[in-house]
């Protein structure tokens, strides 16, 4: 079932990419909070290799679990959720060990922590930014988007983040 679903998601995205001329590389990311059982995660990883499957960790315990799983060196690990110094340190140490870690900034203060820890550990972090769109979608999750969303940076915070990265000579870390 898992193999079939990974393949179906990949094929649907490939078809949509061709239809709309989307050329960028894409990845399927499995949030391990869905099911943290090692056999399930390993099955996702093993079958997902040919589909650029990566893992998402939304907490420090999840990040420990992700680091402990044998993934491909090119496989993405996306770090979302609340990030304190110890979470960021663990993520950056995993990056130094060869994991392909991306820290997704959801609050402006996280950038300071990432910059501080990266400097201490002498590592160039991979940074993503979650933005809070002014408009919201429709359907079940309509109220969790737009200005009412509790996650992501506003457009003015995004500009502050870009200024911060430029001043810290870290603009190239934004992926």
Q: What do the PLM-derived regions correspond to, one by one?
A:
Residues 13-22:
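Surface-exposed helix-capping loop/turn segments at secondary-structure junctions
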Residues 21, 26-175:
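Active-site-proximal beta-alpha core segment in soluble small-molecule metabolic enzymes
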Residues 1-13:
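N-terminal hydrophobic targeting/anchoring segments and the immediately downstream early-domain regions
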């Amino acid at each position: 079932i898992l193999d079939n679903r990974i393949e179906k998601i990949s094929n649907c995205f490939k078809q949509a990419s061709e239809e709309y001329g989307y050329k960028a590389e894409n990845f399927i990311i499995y949030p391990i909070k869905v099911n943290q059982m090692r056999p399930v995660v390993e099955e996702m990883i093993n079958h997902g290799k040919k589909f650029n499957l990566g893992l998402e960790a939304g907490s420090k315990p999840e990040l420990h679990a992700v680091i402990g799983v044998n993934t491909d060196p090119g496989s993405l690990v996306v770090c979302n959720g609340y990030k304190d110094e110890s979470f960021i340190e663990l993520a950056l140490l995993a990056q130094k060990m060869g994991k392909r870690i991306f820290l997704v900034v959801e609050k402006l203060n996280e950038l300071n922590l990432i910059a501080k820890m990266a400097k201490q550990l002498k590592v160039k972090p991979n940074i993503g930014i979650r933005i809070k769109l002014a408009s919201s979608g429709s359907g079940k999750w309509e109220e969790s988007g737009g200005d009412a969303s509790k996650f992501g940076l506003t457009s003015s915070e995004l500009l502050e983040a870009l200024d911060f990265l430029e001043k810290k000579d870290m603009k190239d870390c934004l992926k």
